From Swiss-Prot:
The modification Phosphoserine is found at residues 80-81, 127, 393. The gene is Sv2a. It comes from Mus musculus (Mouse). This is Synaptic vesicle glycoprotein 2A. The lineage of its organism: Eukaryota, Metazoa, Chordata, Craniata, Vertebrata. Glycans are attached at residues 498, 548, 573. Plays a role in the control of regulated secretion in neural and endocrine cells, enhancing selectively low-frequency neurotransmission. Positively regulates vesicle fusion by maintaining the readily releasable pool of secretory vesicles. The keyword Transmembrane applies. Residues 40-145 are annotated as: Disordered.
Length: 742
């Protein structure tokens, strides 16, 4: 009996030993998997347990981990003392051995951060497990943020400026280029799309408006989310939304679906400007920030030039189209819409190779991720400069104390979409709270003044840049009307018309037994005329009307002479057979006017190149405020030259002049917006101000274009007053040149 009891006790003790050994090895393998980090940025591998044996079959090397006598006793006796119970001697590491990514909480007494600030067992400036009670939390976060700003600037200087920043520059430039393309797409396709989709004037106006509406919503939405979810992630999502719906819009046939796709395409691209500038600024040291953010602005100009060049090269080529029956038509303007999605697609592919902003990681307490990205920046630049041996010396980086914003979701909280709804509401509340913090007493004055500057700048710039082409078209129409030929009181009998009539007025004419076969009528008007025993076949017309005319025994076969083209006219015993299918509205289609739109836009966007270069070279020398105010004053002065624009060439020259001097103020405003707000509010504030910019653009376009053909005084007065007000407000803002990024 006793022998059986001893056997059972030995069996139980052996089972416990086996279980303990399995548990120990399982824990070690988990830790080993976590600590064996592949540094994807420097391509170096590190492992805490590189030389540790996983199995007793492979003895540890002579220089392996220290194993004390307690461990030998445990192996020999199968027991452990109270002093060593729960302690895994295999995890002891020699001093100086790599122990994974440096972490802020791993610093011991006497250790210091990169900027020299002491760090003793803290993370984000707070002791583990301790948080500042009550109102001390925000004060501590503010103090942490100030220390982080100084240290982050020091780290960026150590990382240097080189290949990494230039690579990111071109990647983000593609995203900014996509925004520049989006602004011009609808305006370029309207002359062609209006006939395919049979667009009335109100529909065309809504199509132009919907793009700005989508960009306004997208700027606010993605700007707010980028401060919570990350710059890179939100930019990838927003560009994906833009490219997907831009692709769909090139194939859809109906006006409603096309409008919907362009709306969502605008929502997607709306996040480009606020995220791109914030993202890039967080990789730039103070002495490089103003200049290189200004260089980045050039890609918006490149986007406009790309759109104008592609429209010029693609849309007039009718051979690039096909159709399947009468229901589906794919014309060349749809190819243009598809090509305009390429910058966004390429930006997505390139952005997947780039890391998240390390400043965003640090603001959200992710020390290890930030350290890895900064190490990548350092190693990339040092290798490019021929110094691969230089080691990234930073070991500890300040992080911001994180407030607990998590919500508890019970496991029985309905279905999965209800749980996602709760998370979405929580995220929305955080975004809204962050937006409201931009109006806190600390930032209220800056935000209100920036709203004024953004609104006035956008109101005048977009209003004038759209007013210029409209004025050019008006001058063309006036010149065209001045060359109209008038034929009064003509009498024509037994004549066949099979040629083109253009820009003519026929008054009091009489037409007997005449045939109009294969005739094209363009801007032709028949007034007080009589048509008797006439025959119209295969007639195509645009801007053609019959006013106060009489038709007797006349046949219309396969024509597009719809009812609205007969104004106060009588049709006696007349017949319409097999009218042409398609849009019954009178549209002009593509032609010389469309070419002029492409040409004017091409020159207008290309003209900002000198202003971009000058602003980039002087931004860090004269300061943001002087650049902004000076450019606004020059733009205001250039407005007064509009009174001399009495010809097409003069208006084109004035458009180029205004664009060239005003671009510097936009560059300065972008840099100023980035530097005035802290990292946790940067894209939120930028997105809100950019959304306000799009609202001002809609108002400016609506007001300025309403005066086309009426007066030039009102646009000159409105633009000058807005620019003067904006420059005066800008001078009251704080100068950010020479300051570290908050």
């Amino acid at each position: 009996m006793e022998e059986g009891f001893r056997d059972r006790a030995a069996f139980i003790r052996g089972a416990k030993d086996i279980a303990k050994e399995v548990k120990k090895h399982a824990a070690k393998k988990v830790v080993k998997g976590l600590d064996r980090v592949q540094d994807e940025y420097s391509r170096r591998s590190y492992s805490r347990f590189e030389e540790e044996d996983d199995d007793d079959d492979f003895p540890a090397p002579a220089d392996g981990y220290y194993r004390g006598e307690g461990a030998q006793d445990e192996e020999e006796g199968g027991a452990s003392s109270d002093a060593t119970e729960g302690h895994d001697e295999d995890d002891e590491i020699y001093e100086g051995e790599y122990q994974g990514i440096p972490r802020a909480e791993s610093g011991g007494k006497g250790e210091r951060m990169a900027d020299g600030a002491p760090l003793a067992g803290v993370r984000g400036g707070l002791s583990d497990g301790e948080g500042p009670p009550g109102g001390r939390g925000e004060a501590q976060r503010r103090k942490d943020r100030e220390e982080l700003a100084q240290q982050y600037e020091t780290i960026l200087r150590e990382c240097g400026h080189g290949r990494f920043q230039w690579t990111l520059y071109f990647v983000l430039g593609l995203a900014l280029m996509a925004d520049g393309v989006e602004v011009f797409v609808v305006g370029f396709v309207l002359p062609s799309a209006e006939k395919d989709m049979c667009l009335s004037d109100s529909n065309k106006g809504m199509l132009g408006l919907i793009v700005y509406l989508g960009m306004m919503v997208g700027a606010f939405l993605w700007g707010g989310l980028a401060d919570r979810l990350g710059r890179r992630q939100c930019l990838l999502i927003s560009l994906s939304v833009n490219s997907v719906f831009a692709f769909f819009s090139s194939f859809v046939q109906g006006y409603g679906t096309f409008l919907f796709c362009r709306l969502l395409s605008g929502v997607g691209i709306g996040g480009s400007i606020p995220i791109v500038f914030s993202y890039f600024s967080e990789f730039l040291a103070q002495e490089k920030r103003g200049e290189h953010l200004s260089w980045l602005c050039m890609f918006w100009m490149i986007g406009g030039v790309y759109a104008a060049a592609m429209a010029w090269a693609i849309i007039p080529h009718y051979g690039w189209s096909f159709q399947m029956g009468s229901a589906y038509q794919f014309h060349s303007w749809r190819v243009f819409v598809l090509v305009c999605a390429f910058p966004s697609v390429f930006a997505i592919g390139a952005l997947t190779t780039q890391p998240e902003s390390p400043r965003f990681f640090l603001e959200n307490g992710k020390h290890d991720e930030a350290w890895m990205v900064l190490k990548q920046v350092h190693d990339t630049n040092m290798r490019a400069k021929g110094h691969p041996e230089r080691v990234f010396s930073v070991t500890h980086i300040k992080t911001i104390h994180q407030e607990d914003e998590l919500i508890e979701i019970q496991s029985d909280t309905g279905t999965w979409y209800q749980r996602w709804g709760v998370r979405a509401l929580s995220l929305g509340g955080q975004v809204w709270g962050n937006f409201l913090s931009c109006f806190s007493p600390e930032y209220r004055r800056i935000t209100l003044m920036m709203m004024g500057v953004w609104f006035t700048m956008s109101f005048s710039y977009y209003g004038l840049t759209v007013w210029f082409p409209d004025m050019i078209r008006h001058l063309q129409a006036v010149d065209y009307a001045a060359r109209t030929k008038v034929f009064p009181g003509e009498r024509v009998e037994h004549v066949t018309f099979n040629f083109t009539l253009e820009n003519q007025i026929h008054r009091g004419g009489q037409y007997f037994n005449d045939k109009f076969i294969g005739l094209r009528l363009k801007s032709v008007s028949f007034e007080d005329s009589l048509f008797e025993e006439c025959y119209f076949e295969d007639v195509t017309s645009s801007n053609t009307f019959f006013r106060n005319c009489t038709f007797i025994n006349t046949v219309f076969y396969n024509t597009d002479l719809f009812e609205y083209k007969f104004v106060n006219s009588r049709l006696v015993n007349s017949t319409f057979l097999h009218n042409k299918e398609g849009c019954p509205l009178d549209v002009t289609g593509t032609g010389e006017g469309a070419y002029m739109v492409y040409f004017v836009s091409f020159l207008g966007t290309l003209a900002v190149l000198p202003g971009n270069i000058v602003s980039a070279l002087l931004m860090d020398k004269i300061g943001r405020l002087r650049m902004l105010a000076g450019s606004s004053v020059l733009s205001c002065v250039s407005c007064f030259f509009l009174s001399f624009g009495n010809s097409e060439s003069a208006m084109i020259a004035l458009l180029c002049l205004f664009g060239g001097v005003s671009i510097a103020s936009w560059n300065a405003l972008d840099v100023l917006t980035v530097e005035l707000y802290p990292s946790d509010k940067r894209t939120t504030a930028f997105g809100f101000l950019n959304a306000l910019c799009k609202l001002a653009a809609v108002l400016g376009i609506s007001i300025f274009t309403s005066f086309v053909g009426i007066t030039k005084a009102a646009p000159i007065l409105f633009a000058s007053a807005a620019l003067a007000l904006g420059s005066s407000l800008a001078l009251k803002l704080p100068e950010t040149r020479g300051q570290v990024l908050q």
